[in-house]
Amino acid sequence: MACVRQRTKGRVGVDYAYQADGWQAFYGAVAGASAALTGLLFVALSLNSVIVRDAAHRGRAREALSGLLILVVLALIVLIPGQGQRPLGWELLVGGVVLEVFGLRLQAETVTGLPSAHRPRWVTRLVPLHLATLAVPAAGASLLVGRYGGLLWLLPTILVYLIWSTTNAWMLVVQAANEERQ
């Protein structure tokens, strides 16, 4: 993929940030990796039913599974062949707003189930996740106006969601094993 630079009104634009076709291999890898991790996590959660007894464990399980599923769906949306910049922009903008609203609702449900002493720390740990989620509608808006980064906004989302989901999955499996020993 060639990096094409274009000068527009004193700024340098990177055309590939606005063309989904140039990202096919990347999003194919994201979809494949996320789908594989989702399957592994689903099996691990099925084998460790003790996890769903605790509100924090349920919250982590939901975050890990939903984060990976969101990455699969996000990748599939970008991989739709022949899709123009504007339709993709609208899909990301609307989908990202809906995603954030539902995410906040589910996190509020988790927080209310936690002991009050653990709530501030839980809410604080969610800041990177929600900032990464807000990058999805930012990518959509950027595609719609044709400036400010386009699909590059999704890179932090993908990195944060992969790291977040993998870390949560690991913590769940390790904590479940520790609790079974006790």
What are the residue ranges of the model-derived segments?
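Alpha-helical transmembrane segments
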Residues: 22-35, 86-100, 153-162
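Terminal transmembrane helical module of multi-pass membrane proteins
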Residues: 136-182
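Juxtamembrane helix-loop boundaries in multi-pass membrane proteins
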Residues: 15, 22-32, 52-73, 115-133, ...
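Hydrophobic alpha-helical transmembrane segments in multi-pass integral membrane proteins
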Residues: 72-81, 131-147
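C-terminal ends of transmembrane helices
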Residues: 44-55, 104-116, 169-175
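N-terminal signal-anchor/start-transfer transmembrane helix
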Residues: 31-49
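Membrane-helix boundary elements
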Residues: 17-21, 70-90, 108
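Short, strongly hydrophobic alpha-helical membrane anchors
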Residues: 1-25
